[in-house]
A protein has these predicted regions:
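A short glycine/small-residue-enriched secondary-structure motif
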Residues: 9-13, 52-67
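Amphipathic alpha-helical interaction surfaces
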Residues: 23, 40-47, 126, 130-133
Length: 180
């Protein structure tokens, strides 16, 4: 029998979720398989001293602010709070104080930061915590297998650290319009 390390396990879960999605299998099953990979990868990223959610938020804000400084749309949802954050980071970029996403300091509580992924982990936690609320229900509108996969692939990139994605991942991201 072959030995499977955690990165390989995560890669196999993501690959399986992509295959399941392409075969139009149950969205809950696809979402949970992708979320399982994300959960594993999030912990691997943390073992490297980073926080997945904080990194994703910083990268998103930085890219939006950079776009704004170049006269392009920020690409963020309409929100006064987000606009203020993106504007502040754009000012920092223009002043030379912000040169990368790593220069952004997050002051939000960990709970607030982690709320960003609630929509991804809701179906996963629904199944995981059946002992706490055996009569709970879940709306199928809460399933977002494509979003869970995109996050899992982002976490995979962070955990891997070399910027390389397996070909099936890049094919999926191109189909989703995430990679060009």
């Amino acid at each position: 029998m072959a030995i499977v390390d955690k990165m390989t396990a995560a890669e196999r879960l993501i690959h399986s979720a992509v295959d399941m999605l392409e075969r139009n299998e149950d969205p809950l099953a696809v979402h949970v398989v992708a979320s399982s990979a994300l959960s594993l990868l999030r912990e691997l990223v943390a073992s490297q001293g980073n926080d997945y959610v904080s990194q994703v938020i910083k990268e998103g804000v930085y890219r939006s602010a950079l776009a704004k400084t170049q006269g392009a749309p920020a690409g963020m949802p309409d929100s006064d709070i987000l606009d203020a954050i993106v504007n502040a980071v754009a000012e920092g970029i223009e002043a030379g104080r912000v040169k990368s996403a790593g220069d952004i300091v997050m002051v939000a509580s960990k709970k607030t930061v982690w709320a960003y992924l609630d929509y991804i982990f809701k179906p996963y936690n629904f199944l995981k915590h059946a002992d706490r609320d055996p009569l709970a229900t879940l709306d199928e509108a809460d399933f977002d297998p494509e979003g869970a996969l995109a996050h899992a692939m982002t976490a995979y990139l962070m955990a891997r650290g070399d910027g390389e994605l397996p070909e099936p991942f890049t094919v999926f991201l191109k189909k989703q319009g995430i990679l060009v």
